From Swiss-Prot:
GO biological-process terms attached to the record: transmembrane transport
Protein name: Mitochondrial tricarboxylate transporter 1
Disruption phenotype: Decreases the production of itaconic acid.
Primary subcellular site in the record, as a coarse category: mitochondrion
Annotated transmembrane regions: 11-31, 67-87, 114-134, 172-191, 208-228, 277-297
Gene: MTT1
Originating species: Mycosarcoma maydis
A GO CC annotation given for this chain: mitochondrial membrane
Similarity field: Belongs to the mitochondrial carrier (TC 2.A.29) family.
Length: 300
């Protein structure tokens, strides 16, 4: 069974996934903004590193840019979220079909997690890296005294490509693949395991569960994914920032961060990210299931 607890066509999984991703992107962007800004390694006028709390980030952003500042880079994330969720659910359902036991038609828990990892790797390459690089650069740029890029998704992306080439929107691909592959394995694997277990635990003959249960297990799977993949997320953000050239590689970024800021820096932004993924997990799986129901009809 796919995440919706039923077999759905590839076209339905893509549309349902893309719709869920777009809704989730809008609903959680302010929290994502706080997480991203808190992961930068900002410096004061003397070159000393500063640490900003989420409250300080909100206050500073509202003072300088108003409420719209909390949505800087939102369009890039919504477009990227729609694309990556469409790829994720399409790939996940296809990988699950490929990994099913040929004789029993069932899927083991390990195969569930492997399917999630495969889906995460594909979405990282085709959707997540470019969209998150653009989002990160636009947010980072908006905080600088002299912005380098034009505002807005289209003009901002054009500025990045013009100045840095296509490689400019594929920075940090290694940590993105590491983060997305492991996060999707944990998130989709955990959700599917709970999704399959819940109806059985209640003695239900149907795979249908109510929206509150869907939201709850989606949120729970998001929290588990956060703390299992947070270091990858911090490295990804730093490798995609405007001053990422100071890192020779992902390994250099890791060792430099540990040397100058300590291991705690690898979990910076974890509170903001866990807040986002609690909402994200609940929203994306709930919307996905509802869109599947609308497009494919009630379960027979």
């Amino acid at each position: 069974m796919p995440p919706s607890g039923r077999k759905v066509s590839p076209s339905v999984s893509v549309v349902a996934g893309a719709t869920a991703g777009a809704v989730e992107g809008v609903a959680t962007f302010p929290i994502e903004y706080l997480k991203t800004v808190s992961q930068f390694a900002p410096r004061d006028v003397h070159g000393n590193q500063q640490r900003l709390s989420p409250i300080e980030v909100v206050r500073s952003t509202l003072q300088k840019e108003g409420p719209k500042g909390l949505f800087r880079g939102c369009t890039a994330m919504v477009v990227g979220n729609a694309g990556k969720a469409g790829v994720r659910f399409f790939a996940f359902e296809n990988f699950r079909s490929m990994l099913k036991n040929k004789s029993t038609g069932k899927l083991s828990n390990s195969s569930n997690y492997l399917a999630g990892m495969g889906a995460g790797t594909l979405e990282a390459i085709f959707a997540v890296t470019p969209s998150e690089t653009i989002k990160t650069k636009l947010i980072d740029d908006s905080k600088r005294a002299k912005p380098r890029y034009e505002q807005g998704l289209v003009r901002g992306t054009a500025s990045i490509v013009r100045q840095e080439g296509l490689a400019g929107i594929y920075q940090g691909v290694v940590p993105v693949v590491m983060r997305q592959g492991s996060a999707s394995a944990i998130r989709l694997g955990t959700y599917s395991a709970l999704r399959d277990w819940l109806p059985k635990a209640h003695g239900s003959g149907s795979s249908l569960i109510n929206w509150l249960a869907t939201f709850s297990i989606g949120a729970a799977s998001g929290v588990v994914a956060v703390y299992g993949t947070m270091p990858f997320d911090v490295l990804k953000t730093r490798m995609q920032a405007i001053d990422a050239a100071r890192y020779r590689s992902t390994w250099h970024c890791l060792t430099n961060t540990l040397k100058t800021e300590g291991a705690a820096a690898l979990w910076r932004g974890s509170v903001s990210r866990s807040m986002r993924l609690i909402v994200s997990g609940g929203v994306i799986f709930s919307v996905y299931e509802q869109v599947v129901w609308l497009l494919a009809g009630p379960e027979s």
